[in-house]
């Protein structure tokens, strides 16, 4: 099975599907507690258009290794140190650097489309802004940077409680169960997601959340994301949200990469994983937008299907 390591302490599981000669490659990045299979509703669609598709389980998730984090790490250690086997962190910037190294290993040097969900968007936008020579389009799904500092500071109890690690998974399960699913979401989806979250190692989950939004400098906070990404997202950008609030940061605070091509789409009523439950509508937006930005050939009006 394919694994890749930038930091020797992490073996990252990935799949490389589609033609190696494809003109464009899609990198799929998941959110907190998720795995590559969360994109199973999109992969067949992407492959049907002869795109190369790279799916990866990031640090601590899915089939990738999840070594015990160093509790002394309270800020991102940086590019070089995050590759050191003695440095075990779970910041999204480290995840992004892992993915960039993997793409280089696979010989992917241009025409990359990044699609990321929720916490994965911190890594996705990092990749898009760090490597504008590589990324030609960015697609964000319910970006985590919708949350402002005011909300993050209100929730510091999640990290400051003396029993924080013991409480973090039950707290997240309660939060996700309450706020991330609508009455229209089927029971099987909610059951699957929350049972999967319950399987996590508590120390790894704590480290993922700390790196994602607990650290006052983390990219999962609106103000930090705007500071890090505003004006640096040069590629066309499609932002899809489960409600208007989730797309607000991109709409109101992050300048467009391309005035003519950037879009915001809201698909309401199907929760945080709407790309699973409304996959035909979601994939339809991807197809239309890919045609708009030139990734797929445009279909002339009235052309036979």
PLM regions and their residue ranges:
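Conserved acidic catalytic loop of the alpha/beta-hydrolase fold
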Residues: 93-112
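Short beta-strand immediately N-terminal to the catalytic nucleophile in serine-hydrolase-like folds
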Residues: 114-116, 141
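Conserved alpha/beta-hydrolase catalytic His-Asp/Glu region
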Residues: 149-151, 167-232
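Conserved serine/cysteine hydrolase catalytic core
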Residues: 202-258, 263-266, 299
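Catalytic active-site module of serine/aspartate enzymes centered on a nucleophile-bearing elbow/loop
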Residues: 260-305
């Amino acid at each position: 099975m394919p694994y890749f390591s930038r930091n020797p302490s992490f073996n990252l599981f990935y799949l490389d599907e589609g033609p190696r000669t494809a003109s464009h490659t899609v990198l799929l990045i998941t959110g907190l507690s998720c795995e590559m299979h969360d994109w199973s509703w999109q992969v067949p669609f992407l492959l049907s258009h002869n795109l190369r598709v790279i799916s990866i389980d990031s640090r601590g998730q899915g089939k990738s290794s999840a070594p015990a984090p160093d509790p002394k790490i309270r800020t991102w250690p940086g590019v070089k140190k995050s590759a050191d086997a003695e440095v075990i962190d779970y910041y999204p910037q480290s995840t992004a650097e892992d993915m960039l190294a993997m793409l280089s290993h696979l010989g992917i040097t241009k025409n990359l489309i990044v699609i990321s969900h929720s916490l994965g968007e911190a890594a996705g936008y990092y990749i898009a802004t760090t490597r504008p020579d590589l990324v030609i389009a960015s697609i964000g799904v319910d970006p985590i940077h919708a949350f402002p500092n005011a909300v993050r500071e209100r929730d510091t109890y999640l990290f400051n409680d003396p029993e924080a690690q013991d409480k973090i998974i039950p707290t997240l399960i309660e939060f996700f169960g309450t706020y991330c699913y609508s009455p229209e979401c089927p029971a099987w989806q909610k059951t699957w997601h929350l049972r999967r979250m319950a399987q996590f190692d508590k120390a790894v989950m704590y480290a993922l959340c700390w790196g994602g939004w607990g650290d006052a400098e983390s990219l999962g906070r609106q103000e930090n994301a705007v500071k890090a990404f505003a004006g640096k997202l040069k590629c066309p950008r499609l932002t899809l949200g489960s409600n208007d609030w989730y797309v607000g940061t991109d709409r109101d605070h992050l300048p467009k990469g391309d005035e003519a091509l950037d879009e915001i789409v809201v698909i309401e009523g199907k929760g945080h994983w709407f790309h699973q439950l409304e996959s035909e509508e979601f994939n339809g937006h991807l197809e239309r937008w890919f045609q708009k930005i030139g990734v797929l050939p445009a279909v002339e009006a009235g052309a036979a299907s």
